[in-house]
Amino acid sequence: MFKLENKKYFIGIYALILSLFSLYFTYRANFSNPEFEVLMFCILLIAGILSIVYYTKNNEKLHKVALVLIIIFGIISLFLTPIYDVSDETEHFVRSEIVSTGELSTNYVPIPNTTANGYKTIASVTTFFDNAGANVFNTHADDDKIDHTPSYFNSAFAQNPFYGYLAQGIGVFLAKCLDLNAIWMLWLGRFFNLLLYAGIIAVAIKKAPVFKFPLLIVSILPIAIYQAASTSCDGLFSALAILAFSYFLYFYKTPKIAWTDLGIFYIAVILCGLLKTPYLALSLLIFLVPNTNFSDKKQNIIAKLCILVALGIGIAWSSYATTQLANSWRGEYFIQKNVSASGQIDYLLANPLIALQRFGEIYSTALPTVIDRFFYFSNSVREYSSTLLAGLYFVFFCLFSVFYCNSEDLNLKTRVKGFLIFVLIYSGVMAVQYLTCLQLGEKMLQAAYSVVISCLS
């Protein structure tokens, strides 16, 4: 277990690092009135000190540490992050508001007085779209009461399952019930999503018999908390993947696997996989569990056959989700840009050398982008990033992976097999993006979901 024997020493290091990076970003941004930045420095300094002190008193209960750290820094993030400034948060928030009404599915309906279709929501939700990127200090939209006048938006992530927005929907519903200002729909939606993420992570770390500290490190990455403290369902997806991985660690170490735990593992895998299909491959982790750990031969066989069940559910959902994906601005975009999964596959089959080249780009071009996404905050319009910090995080992870010692480590054979599953999932993520987002023949340039990828690595 990693311990902070001298908390004063680490508090000093934290204060020094925070000061250096604050000065660096202040210099780059050239703030004329840095009063707010000074205030945030003080808040982060206090939050960091409290976190270090709490860790020193609870370093044997890392699930509690994770819960506290995620909530503390998540609350800071959810209030500071500008309106709709998380990737695709506009659409995520529209879906959250729809779910808050009790509508678990979505209806793609004609927009009155137009020839277009869209999703029915309320005026306050679409008003925020005009103030995207603004914070509460430079817009008055947050001062308005909730406007329930029907409004329409062209996309609502209809391809995502409803459970990805239940927590956010509860927050939006509560803001409506309490008749709060409109901004509280966004803030409470973010807050309940954060609580769900923190709760699942706490359960995951508590369940894992080994590698608790690495799971803690991955779960509190800035990009992880940034996503969790938004209305995006990506935070839930990451939490479910980490939960599934923690149950694998439990299976690997327990002398007798319970049916209940096996069921929870597959539920986590399926729920995660329906949000991001390639992660259904997490079910393959069951092959890394020693056969002697299953209660009997029957359980061993059923556990492995359940992989086919998970795959079948994933394929069935993907067929439905693909049709829903076109019911948005993406439908017209795909037509204009000639984006077609079947067309892309035919193109690659007809050009095997290009297919090999594209596969190579997954590692030569996309992998550096994944590393850069360790510190990348964007909604595709406004970007806040730092290659320096991304590089430092990558170096930290490399050093941590090499020097972190655990007396109950996984053996080399299991690590090799786990690495192959990581390669399969990573390649699957890149392949799905290539087939569904890029036009025919375009180079592989996209990369995402570095939180879970870093966990598996």
Indicate residue ranges for each PLM-predicted region.
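Start-transfer (signal-anchor) and selected internal transmembrane alpha helices
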Residues: 2-75, 303-311, 414-419
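Short acidic/glycine- and proline-prone juxtamembrane loop motifs at membrane-interface regions
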Residues: 34, 230-237
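Perimembrane helix-loop-helix junctions
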Residues: 45-46, 247-255, 280-312, 410
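Specific aromatic-rich, kink-prone transmembrane helix
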Residues: 49, 203, 236-254, 267
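Interfacial juxtamembrane loops and adjacent helix segments
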Residues: 101-188
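Membrane-interface alpha helices of multi-pass inner-membrane proteins
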Residues: 226, 261-277, 282-288
